[in-house]
From Swiss-Prot:
It comes from Helicobacter pylori (strain ATCC 700392 / 26695) (Campylobacter pylori). Catalyzes the conversion of glucosamine-6-phosphate to glucosamine-1-phosphate. It is an enzyme of class 5 (isomerase). The keyword Isomerase applies. This is Phosphoglucosamine mutase. The gene is glmM. GO terms for cellular component: cytosol. GO terms for biological process: carbohydrate metabolic process; peptidoglycan biosynthetic process; UDP-N-acetylglucosamine biosynthetic process. It catalyses: alpha-D-glucosamine 1-phosphate = D-glucosamine 6-phosphate.
Length: 445
C-alpha cells in the first residue's frame, strides 16, 4: 500500500489520518531516521488546524515510544521547520499540515537533518517499515530508554532573524505600504513581525485562526479579498500565503494578481543582476508557460524543467547546481536561504526587487506577456491510468497536431484531474479544453 503522495502524507483527519495510523507512521519514520541518527532529536511543528493537536500527540507518542526526544514548537510555517531542523541539529523535522487544503484535511511532511524533503526512495523505505509488523512491535523502549518531549515557544525569533537576514542589508521597507493575508494559517504570527521590523507600513488580514478557518476563502488560493484591500488601502504590494506559508501569491499596486511564471522570470533576472545566481539556470516545472523560457533566454538564462512538486524543483536545482527555481503556483525556492518553498523569503525578495527597480509594482513585475493557458481541476471519482481510457491517445495526437501544449495528470494530494493547455490561439484553446472536460467527465466522474 502506497502511503506517500506528491507532498508527504495527506488525507482527512479522523478518516485516513487516524491516531493509530499516525502512530504507526511515526514509529516507521522514527526507525528510519534512527539508522543515521546523530542527535536523537526530532522537531515537530504544525499549522493552525484543529486536528493538528491530535496528529501531534500521536506522533509524539510514537517517537518517544522508540526512544526519540521530541521538540514541539507549535504553529510555524513549513519552511521554518526545514530551517530549524538543520539549525537546531535535529535528526529530522516533521510538519503537520495539509497546506492549501480545507481544514478537515491534514498531512505530515518529513525533512531530513539538512532540511530537505525526503526523496522517493526514502519514502519507500519508510513505507516498508510501516508494513513490517514484527519490526514495529519489537521497537518499543522501556525504562530510561523511553524518549522525552518538550515544548519550546521562543524559536520563532530564530526564524524571524533568518528571514531578515535574507533581505538586502542596504534596503529597508519604510517607503512601502504592504497588505498581508496570512490565510488564518501558520504565518499569522511571523509575517507581520518581519515586515514591521523592516519598516513597512503593514495591514494584516485573515490573521485570527480558530482551528477551522485556515484557507477559508482567503490566502493564496483566494486572493480576491487581498486584491480589494490593496486597492482600498492604496498599497504598493499585497502578499497572500497559503496555510503553511510555503506558497506565495503577489498582488501589485493596481490589485492585479501577478502570474507565478512572471514572478519566476523577473526574480530570476533580478538575482542575476545581483550576481546571486550560482549558475545560469532557473528551474521550473513542466507547467511553466513557454513565454517564461523565451524571456529567460533573452536574458541569457536557461530554463530547466522538472516534474510538478516543490521537492522535485529542489532536487532538479541540486542536480543543476542552481539556487533559484519554483512553480507557477507560488512555491518559489531561494536555496541560499530555504531548502523548500518559503513564501516569506520570496515576499521579501519581491519587495527588494520593487524597491531597487524604482518602479511601481505593476510595472516592475510585468516583464513579458504570457501565451494563453487554461488550467482546469476536475473532480474525479476514480483514477485509472489515463492511457487506458478509450480515445485518450487520439485526443493527445490531435492536440499535438494543432500545436497545443498539454499536461494532464492526477493530483497527488486530492481526487482531482489537472488539465493544462497552452496555445497561441485562445479561441482554439477554449474549444479544446471544453472537449477534454467532456471526455474526462464521461470517463472519470
Amino acid at each position: 500500500m502506497k502511503i506517500f503522495g506528491t507532498d508527504g502524507v495527506r488525507g482527512k483527519a479522523g478518516v485516513k489520518l487516524t491516531p493509530m495510523f499516525v502512530m504507526r507512521l511515526g514509529i516507521a519514520a522514527g526507525l528510519y531516521f534512527k539508522k543515521h541518527s546523530q542527535t536523537n532529536k526530532i522537531l515537530i511543528g504544525k499549522d493552525t488546524r484543529k486536528s493538528g493537536y491530535m496528529v501531534e500527540n500521536a506522533l509524539v507518542s510514537a517517537l518517544t515510544s522508540i526512544g526519540y526526544n521530541v521538540i514541539q514548537i507549535g504553529p510555524m510555517p513549513t519552511p521554518a521547520i526545514a530551517f530549524l531542523t538543520e539549525d537546531m541539529r535535529c535528526d529530522a523535522g516533521i510538519m503537520i499540515s495539509a497546506s492549501h487544503n480545507p481544514f478537515e484535511d491534514n498531512g505530515i511532511k518529513f525533512f531530513n537533518s539538512y532540511g530537505y524533503k525526503l526523496k522517493e526512495e526514502e519514502e519507500k523505505a519508510i513505507e516498508e517499515i510501516f508494513h513490517d509488523e514484527e519490526l514495529l512491535h519489537s521497537s518499543y523502549k522501556v525504562g530510561e530508554s523511553v524518549g522525552s518531549a518538550k515544548r519550546i515557544d521562543d524559536v520563532i525569533g530564530r526564524y524571524i532573524a533568518h528571514l531578515k537576514h535574507s533581505f538586502p542589508k542596504h534596503l529597508n521597507l519604510q517607503s512601502l505600504r504592504i497588505v498581508l493575508d496570512t490565510a488564518n494559517g501558520a504565518a499569522y504570527k511571523v509575517a507581520p513581525v518581519v515586515f514591521s521590523e523592516l519598516g513597512a507600513d503593514v495591514l494584516v488580514i485573515n490573521d485570527e485562526p480558530n482551528g477551522c478557518n485556515i484557507n477559508d476563502q482567503c490566502g493564496a488560493l483566494h486572493p480576491n479579498q487581498l486584491s480589494q484591500e490593496v486597492k482600498k488601502y492604496r498599497a504598493d504590494l499585497g502578499f497572500a500565503f497559503d496555510g503553511d506559508a510555503d506558497r506565495l501569491v503577489v498582488v501589485d499596486n493596481l490589485g492585479n494578481i501577478v502570474h507565478g511564471d512572471k514572478l519566476l522570470g523577473v526574480l530570476g533576472v533580478y538575482q542575476k543582476s545581483k550576481n546571486a545566481l550560482s549558475s545560469q539556470a532557473v528551474v521550473a516545472t513542466n507547467m511553466s508557460n513557454l513565454a517564461l523560457k523565451e524571456y529567460l533566454k533573452s536574458q541569457d538564462l536557461e530554463l530547466k524543467h522538472c516534474a510538478i512538486g516543490d521537492k522535485f524543483v529542489s532536487e532538479c536545482m541540486q542536480l543543476n547546481k542552481a539556487n533559484f527555481g519554483g512553480e507557477q503556483s507560488g512555491h518559489i525556492i531561494f536555496s541560499d536561504y530555504a531548502k523548500t518553498g518559503d513564501g516569506l523569503v520570496c515576499a521579501l525578495q519581491v519587495s527588494a526587487l520593487v524597491l531597487e527597480s524604482k518602479q511601481v509594482s505593476s510595472v516592475a513585475l510585468n516583464p513579458f506577456e504570457l501565451y494563453p493557458q487554461s488550467l482546469v481541476n476536475l473532480n474525479v471519482q476514480k483514477k485509472p491510468p489515463l492511457e487506458s481510457l478509450k480515445g485518450y491517445s487520439a485526443l493527445l495526437k490531435e492536440l499535438d497536431k494543432l500545436e497545443i501544449r498539454h499536461l494532464i495528470r492526477y493530483s497527488g494530494t486530492e481526487n482531482k484531474l489537472r488539465i493544462l493547455l497552452e496555445a497561441k490561439d485562445e479561441k482554439l484553446l477554449e474549444s479544446k479544453m471544453q472537449e477534454l472536460k467532456e471526455f474526462f467527465e464521461g470517463h472519470l466522474c
